[in-house]
Curated annotation (Swiss-Prot):
GO terms for cellular component: cytosol. This is Elongation factor Tu. Coiled coil: none annotated. Residues 63-67 are annotated as: G2. Belongs to the TRAFAC class translation factor GTPase superfamily. Classic translation factor GTPase family. EF-Tu/EF-1A subfamily. GTP binds at residues 19-26, 84-88, 139-142. Mg(2+) binds at T26. Residues 84-87 are annotated as: G3. Keywords: Cytoplasm, Elongation factor, GTP-binding, Hydrolase, Magnesium, Metal-binding, Nucleotide-binding, Protein biosynthesis. SUPFAM superfamilies: EF-Tu/eEF-1alpha/eIF2-gamma C-terminal domain (SSF50465), P-loop containing nucleoside triphosphate hydrolases (SSF52540), Translation proteins (SSF50447). It is an enzyme of class 3 (hydrolase).
Length: 398
């Protein structure tokens, strides 16, 4: 039987569950799929039980092994892809590698415990990697008799969110019980539906990749006699059309401007190339030696070359093929951005002597050449072509 056609009529949003171990992330994921299957039956809304979500398959993303469960469901207005990372380490890796790009997340906090160390760490990571919209689900409220205690826990969560620059006073907090909803208690099922209504309204529809400013990482460059220089690569975001003015950014100190005189895909002329397309772009007024792999073609003014930034990184374990030993301040590996390696030095946070394989840490990086980067750009850390870490730019410094 043919697979059902993917329905594009509803907007698609990526979300996930985050929070401390055993606070009920996976139970909530199961409850959402199950309650939606009961209340809004459709071919997409199929109940998933705890065990099937918990037994997440291993995936490899940029050389790192991650367990992640992917489930899909739909509300009346939207289609969702939802990720749930079972272990804390999986969650950290997911965020840092960009394997799971979330438009928003549901922060699950057990009312019986209140915020715990991983609650804090996941909030910080969300801030660092650019997950801007969090909704709080206070779970296990059926186990707390004291109304004042629930109020205290809610205040504590809101304060913690404000501490990390989320709108702690204003963001939605829903109190419920994932387990009770899963078991079919209609009062708690109603709360799951309320949670989904909140997700529908509070997490904005993401901007589509084609609506963003053009970014095309250059993979290859060649010249066509009599026509000029062609740069090829996969369009990361945005669109490119004939007669567009573009900038060539990175590696070199100056930004070069040019005009697109042709766009080709599979040797055919196109009117425009879209995000995801592998294209060749013919550039007027650009010599073969004025553009190289590792640069990007971008909409003018949309991205700048930088050498200094803060990054949130995960360092691979020996078992993942990473280093066997720690590294120290001023470690100088290569940073692989999109299509090229650039050497850079690492400065560790004050008070951090060294970084062990398996750690995640915030670092300051200084590259020897400028690269087109912005907050949210992902990179790998490599040593002689071998990946030893993975990171994401959290702040531009120079």
């Amino acid at each position: 039987m043919a697979k059902e056609k993917y329905d594009r009529s509803k907007p698609h949003v990526n979300i996930g569950t985050i929070g401390h171990v055993d606070h009920g992330k996976t139970t909530l994921t199961a409850a959402i799929t199950t309650v939606l299957a009961r209340r809004l039956p459709s071919s997409v809304n199929q109940p998933k039980d705890y065990a099937s979500i918990d037994a997440a398959p291993e995936e490899r993303e940029r050389g790192i092994t991650i367990n992640t469960a992917h489930v899909e469901y739909e509300t009346a207005t939207r289609h969702y892809a939802h990720i749930d990372a079972p272990g804390h380490a999986d969650y950290v890796k997911n965020m840092i590698t960009g394997a799971a790009q979330m438009d928003g997340a549901i922060l699950v906090v057990a009312s019986t415990d209140g915020p715990m160390p991983q609650t804090r760490e996941h909030i910080l990571l969300s801030r660092q990697v650019g997950v801007k919209h969090l909704i709080v689900f206070m779970n296990k409220v059926d186990l707390v008799d004291d109304e004042e205690l629930l109020e205290l826990v809610e205040m504590e969560i809101r304060d913690l969110l404000s501490e990390y620059d989320f709108p702690g006073d204003d963001l939605p907090v829903i109190q419920g019980s994932a387990l009770k909803a899963l078991e079919g208690d209609s009062k708690y099922e109603d709360i799951i539906m309320e949670l989904m209504d909140t997700v529908d309204s509070y997490i904005p529809e993401p901007e589509r990749d084609t609506d963003k400013p053009l970014l095309l990482p250059v993979e290859d460059v060649f010249s066509i006699t009599g026509r000029g220089t062609v740069a090829s690569g996969r369009i990361d975001r945005g669109t490119v059309r004939v007669n567009d003015e573009i900038e060539i950014v990175g590696i070199r100190d100056e930004i070069k401007k040019a005009v697109v005189t042709g766009v080709e895909m599979f040797r055919k002329q196109l009117d425009e190339g879209l995000a995801g397309d592998n294209v060749g772009v013919l550039l007027r007024g650009v010599q073969r030696d004025e553009i190289e792999r590792g640069q990007v073609i971008a909409k003018p003014g949309s991205i700048n070359p930088h050498t200094k930034f803060k990054g949130e990184v995960y360092i691979l374990t020996k078992e993942e093929g990473g280093r066997h030993t720690p590294f120290f301040n001023n470690y100088r590996p290569q940073f692989y951005f999109r299509t090229t390696d650039v050497t850079g030095s690492i400065e560790l946070p004050a008070g951090t002597e060294m970084v062990m394989p398996g750690d995640n840490v915030t670092i300051d990086v200084e590259l020897i050449h400028p690269i087109a980067v912005e907050q949210g750009t992902t990179f790998s850390i490599r040593e002689g072509g071998r990946t030893v870490g993975s990171g994401i730019v959290s702040e531009i410094e120079a």
